[in-house]
């Protein structure tokens, strides 16, 4: 017995692409709080996975779309995101071009020796950087180090979204 199959084919309208819902993937979105920037933490304990590069590309893309972006660099040892942004600022100045720049804050680890004092110091440093950023920007991109640090774990508690780049 033959069963007729009917399919409705529609021509997509330019600029209206919407991905098909995938019921096998639980899709959640952190609720937007008016006047508070969305905090995206980019983390992976592995070094060289592309965290800083991903942070820069996401920030530039969001700024190109008109969003106000803040970036925080928690990798005091390497400071790759900070160096990327310093190079971008130097290029803008040298070439006289108008490119968007995020509000950027490097957040160094504590230099205190006593563990509980160092952890309290790092919490204060992170909050001092994050609180004004979430109030001033639409998005706050947090680049974490390629290691397990107290500062990195604290940043994860602030995340509205987590992104973990993988690189074999």
What are these regions (language model features)?
Residues 1-45:
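Extreme N-terminal, non-catalytic leader segments
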Residues 34, 39, 43-49, 63-139, ...:
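P-loop/Walker-type NTP enzyme "switch/lid" segment
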Residues 53-54:
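Hydrophobic positions on the alpha1 helix immediately C-terminal to the Walker A/P-loop
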Residues 57, 61:
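Active-site signature of alpha/beta-hydrolase-fold catalytic machinery across serine-
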């Amino acid at each position: 017995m033959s069963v007729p199959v009917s399919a409705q084919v529609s021509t997509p309208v330019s600029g209206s692409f919407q991905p098909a819902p995938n019921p096998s993937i639980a899709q959640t979105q952190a609720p937007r709080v008016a006047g508070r920037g969305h905090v995206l933490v980019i983390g992976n304990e592995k070094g060289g996975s592309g965290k800083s590069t991903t942070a820069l590309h996401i920030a530039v893309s969001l700024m190109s779309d008109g969003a106000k972006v803040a970036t925080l660099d928690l990798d005091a040892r390497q400071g790759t995101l900070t160096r990327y942004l310093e190079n971008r600022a130097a290029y803008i100045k040298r070439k006289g071009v108008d490119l968007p720049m995020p509000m950027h804050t490097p957040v160094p680890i504590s230099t205190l020796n006593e563990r509980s004092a160092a952890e309290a110091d790092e919490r204060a440093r992170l909050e001092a950087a994050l609180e004004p950023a979430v109030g001033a920007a639409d998005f706050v991109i947090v680049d974490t180090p390629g290691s397990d640090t107290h500062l990195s774990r604290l940043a994860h508690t602030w995340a509205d979204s987590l992104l973990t780049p993988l690189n074999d």
